[in-house]
């Protein structure tokens, strides 16, 4: 078998700029990981004329899996270029992989960019906001994402809005989380408010803070977000778009961080098992090697010291073995 292949996977777009941006990001992440990282989309991108992509056709996940299978790859590692746990990465990619009859080849999907708490994204969004010239009190901030059919993704948007308010010292009316679009039906009300509605409550020099990664039909300078703002902003409201997250200098490092930390539970099980066994053997070791006349207090101190040493040694070992940077 030929080892591991790493894929940086985005949702895909019919716009060449999105694929070209994905390729640039993959190169930057490759430099950081010191391994080849291949740019791949879930769908759409193969419809782009290769002439608009420097003569190199785009690759979608289905084709990447088939190629990996033909090359004898034993594990595909997916780095999701997604903010939250989109169904594209929780359902679609595993299904496409299974349908390809991969045999012994494994699929590992790392965490999306939000991670556990969105800490890194909060800082990047704050940077992009300030880059527009915004200052506290200058105008309403509209944190805008695409809109999602699942609440878990919208929860990431709302958590980022809360973190930004705390970091910037803003009230809810000063920073509003909103969606570009949503599906019809009350079951999708969690996306509220829509950007077109949130604009009605905006004041001053408003900034639409883009929770989008790459330019395309939605997030380009003449994309859907800009069109909505032009058509629905109240008369007299000044507004501007922030840079996209894909342009932030820290994004490659964040992707590399997601690559370096796995969510595999096996190391944790090994850690717990090894710790329990070591704790059980510690009293036996102390009784064999401690002086016979050592009192209870001395033995307790030895036991506590040995316990601390075990935890430190095991932590350092498992961190180096399973959390090391690839």
Name each region found by the language model.
Residues 279-283, 304-312:
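Core hydrophobic alpha-helical transmembrane segments of single-pass membrane proteins
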Residues 1-266:
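Extended amphipathic ligand-handling, pore-lining, and cofactor/metal-binding catalytic surfaces
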Residues 310-326:
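Membrane-helix interfacial anchor on the cytosolic side
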Residues 271-292:
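N-terminal signal sequences
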Residues 43, 287-292, 317-320:
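Transmembrane helix-loop junctions and nearby membrane-interface residues
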Residues 295-303:
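Non-cytosolic membrane-interface motifs at loop->transmembrane helix junctions
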């Amino acid at each position: 078998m030929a080892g591991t292949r790493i894929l940086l996977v985005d949702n895909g777009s019919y716009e060449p700029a999105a694929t070209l941006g994905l390729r640039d990001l993959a190169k930057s992440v490759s430099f950081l990981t010191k391994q080849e990282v291949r740019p791949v989309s879930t769908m759409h991108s193969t419809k782009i004329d290769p002439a608009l992509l420097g003569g190199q056709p785009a690759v979608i996940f289905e084709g990447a899996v088939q190629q990996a299978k033909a090359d004898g790859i034993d594990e595909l590692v997916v780095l999701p270029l997604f903010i939250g746990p989109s169904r594209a990465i929780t359902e679609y990619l595993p299904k496409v992989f299974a349908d390809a009859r991969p045999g012994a080849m494994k699929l590992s999907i790392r965490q999306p960019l939000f991670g556990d708490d969105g800490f890194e994204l909060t800082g990047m969004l704050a940077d992009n906001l300030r880059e527009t010239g915004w200052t506290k009190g200058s105008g309403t901030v509209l944190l805008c994402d695409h809109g999602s059919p699942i609440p878990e993704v919208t929860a990431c948007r709302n958590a980022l809005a809360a973190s930004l308010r705390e970091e910037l010292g803003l009230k809810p009316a000063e920073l509003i989380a909103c969606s570009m679009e949503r599906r019809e039906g009350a079951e999708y009300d969690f996306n509220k408010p829509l950007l077109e509605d949130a604009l009605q409550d905006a004041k001053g020099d408003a900034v639409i803070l883009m929770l989008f990664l790459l330019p395309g039909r939605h997030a380009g300078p003449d994309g859907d977000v800009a069109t909505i703002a032009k058509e629905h902003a109240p008369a007299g409201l000044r507004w501007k778009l922030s840079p996209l997250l894909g342009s932030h200098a820290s994004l490659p490092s964040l992707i590399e961080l997601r690559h370096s930390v796995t969510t595999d539970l096996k190391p944790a099980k090994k850690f717990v098992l090894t710790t329990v066994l070591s704790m059980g053997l510690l009293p036996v070791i102390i009784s064999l090697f401690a002086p016979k006349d050592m009192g209870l207090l001395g033995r307790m101190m030895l036991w506590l010291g040995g316990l601390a040493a075990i935890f430190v040694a095991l932590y350092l070992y498992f961190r180096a073995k399973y959390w090391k940077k690839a």
